[in-house]
Structure formats: structure tokens, C-alpha cells
């Protein structure tokens, strides 16, 4: 499976690493700072250094997974996914967002013809070893 994860903080980085190491998935890793992307590439992911490249590197229908903190930064990233994505792409919010924010984002994504998953992630940085718990809702 091909999965794009944007946000190579502690959670996003280790999730990408686990998907490559233990799941044999093609992972496209994106982050605003290139050092984090370079580190993900060393661990087997494919790097993307801009949101445009992140979207372009994936075949449609894409999995556009945001692993950014809840709040404004997540809103801005989802706006970019909607702007650059194609009908049928799947947008995933991995932040543990306030439910009303998730409802608002879901409506925006669906209105653009994309699919939505709210997938708050738990498991901390040790999730690489033992796996992650995701609380998923959406399309």
C-alpha cells in the first residue's frame, strides 16, 4: 500500500518507520524541515520537501495523512490537501482534534469530492515497537 504522511515529529516519524519496516508499505514522508525528511529517507521512506511534491509523488487515489498538532496548523494542511488533491483521495487527520473541528474539516473535504477520516493516534513514541491505537471515524 502507498501512504503519505505529512509531519515527521516523534509520532509521524515513527509511524512512517513502522509502516516501512513492519508493513512493507511505500511511505511518502513530508515535513516543513528537510532534516526530518532526510532522516525518514534514511529509514526507507520516500522524501517530499513540499506539499506539492508530497501530493504529486502519490498515485490516485492518494492517502494524505496529516500528523500535525491539533489546531491552526492542521487546518492549513487540510486546506492544502483539498486544494491539491483529486476526487477520491483520502484525507486523514491524525491529530487528536476537537470534535467540532473534525466535523467542520470533514464537511470541507467532502464538499471538494475527497474522502475524510479522523484518526486520532495514541501510542506515543513507543508505538513503533508495540503498534499504535487509532480512534477512527469518517467515510
Labelled PLM ranges:
Residues 1-62, 85-88, 125-128:
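NAD(P)+-binding Rossmann beta1-loop-alpha1 motif at the extreme N-terminus of oxidoreductases
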Residues 3, 74-77, 98-139:
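Rossmann-fold dinucleotide-binding core
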Residues 16-18, 41-42, 76-79, 103-106:
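Short amphipathic alpha-helical segments
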Residues 30, 67, 95, 137:
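Active-site-adjacent beta-strand anchor residues
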Residues 48-49, 92-93, 115-119:
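General beta-strand structural signal in soluble alpha/beta enzymes
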Residues 52, 64-80, 98-101:
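Beta-loop-alpha module in the N-terminal Rossmann-like domain of NAD(P)-dependent dehydrogenases
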Residues 66, 82-106:
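ADP-ribose/adenylate-binding Rossmann-like module
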Amino acid at each position: 500500500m502507498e501512504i503519505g504522511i505529512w509531519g515527521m515529529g516523534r509520532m509521524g516519524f515513527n509511524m512512517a518507520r513502522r509502516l516501512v519496516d513492519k508493513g512493507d508499505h511505500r511511505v511518502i514522508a513530508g515535513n516543513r524541515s528537510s532534516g526530518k525528511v532526510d532522516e525518514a529517507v534514511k529509514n526507507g521512506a520516500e522524501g517530499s520537501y513540499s506539499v506539492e511534491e508530497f501530493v504529486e509523488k502519490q498515485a490516485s487515489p492518494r492517502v494524505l495523512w496529516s500528523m500535525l498538532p491539533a489546531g491552526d496548523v492542521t487546518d492549513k494542511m487540510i486546506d492544502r490537501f483539498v486544494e491539491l488533491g483529486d476526487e477520491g483521495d483520502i484525507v486523514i487527520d491524525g491529530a487528536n482534534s476537537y470534535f467540532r473541528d473534525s466535523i467542520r474539516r470533514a464537511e470541507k473535504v467532502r464538499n471538494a469530492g475527497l474522502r475524510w477520516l479522523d484518526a486520532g493516534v495514541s501510542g506515543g513514541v513507543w508505538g513503533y515497537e508495540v503498534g499504535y491505537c487509532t480512534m477512527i471515524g469518517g467515510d
